[in-house]
């Protein structure tokens, strides 16, 4: 097994979790704990992701903790959660109210910080009673991409959510798909309740 030494800690490197332009995310282990080991091809991408993490964290959004970073080796190491993503849960059952309460808390932090993040449910993990954002996107505030106008529809079993689940390779339960009218009512009710 390959090992990598980052700031006097020796990480056992496992499977490749993701590979995108200029970035490889690997599963890493140190003292019986698992981490996301992010290796960057260039310093600009490394610095951009580090700045993105700091900006999201300053906004008050729960994200996996940055355990360590090494600019020379262009590595960021984050804590790793084994819990299911919100999209995985939605594929088998409706999301519980705790998800929506936490999601609107995140949305509130985004609004106050004048930023938007990716509100699609595959970018969130519920650990205990805390929802964590595990997505990559952070942009300046954009009313067309906010939770109410863009993302919330994918958190309930609407036609859009079913199409999205199908695109991601999940089986669809046609009996669970709610009508457009019911989806709109649910979105308004969630917004009134938690905003």
Please provide the spans of the model-predicted regions:
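ATP-binding glycine-rich loop module of kinase domains
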Residues: 10-50
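Conserved hydrophobic "DFG−1" position in protein kinase catalytic cores
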Residues: 27, 39, 68, 77-80, ...
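A short, low-complexity linker immediately N-terminal to eukaryotic Hanks-type protein kinase catalytic domains
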Residues: 1-13
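Protein kinase-like catalytic core scaffold
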Residues: 35, 62, 76, 132-134
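C-lobe/activation-segment region of protein kinase-like
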Residues: 112-115, 127-195
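Structural motif at the C-terminus of the N-lobe alphaC helix and the adjacent alphaC-beta4 loop
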Residues: 51-62
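Conserved structural core of kinase catalytic domains
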Residues: 61-102
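Hydrophobic residue at the +6 position relative to the catalytic HRD Asp in the kinase catalytic loop
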Residues: 119-124
């Amino acid at each position: 097994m390959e090992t990598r030494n980052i700031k006097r800690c020796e990480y056992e490197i496992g499977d490749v979790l993701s590979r995108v332009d200029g970035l490889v995310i690997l599963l890493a282990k140190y003292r019986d704990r698992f981490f996301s080991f992010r290796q960057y091809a260039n310093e600009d991408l490394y610095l951009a992701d580090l700045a993105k993490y700091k900006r999201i964290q300053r906004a008050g959004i729960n994200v996996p903790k940055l355990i360590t970073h090494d600019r020379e080796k262009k590595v960021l190491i984050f804590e790793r959660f084994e819990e299911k993503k919100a999209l995985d849960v939605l594929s088998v059952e409706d999301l519980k109210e705790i998800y929506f309460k936490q999601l609107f808390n995140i949305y509130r932090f985004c609004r106050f910080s004048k930023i938007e993040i990716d509100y699609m449910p595959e970018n969130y993990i519920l650990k205990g009673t805390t929802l964590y954002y595990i997505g990559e996107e952070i942009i300046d505030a954009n009313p067309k991409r906010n939770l109410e106008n863009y993302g919330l529809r994918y958190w309930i079993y609407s036609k859009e959510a079913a199409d999205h689940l199908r695109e991601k390779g999940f089986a669809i339960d046609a009996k669970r798909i709610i009508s457009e009218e019911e989806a709109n009512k649910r979105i308004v009710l969630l917004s009134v309740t938690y905003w």
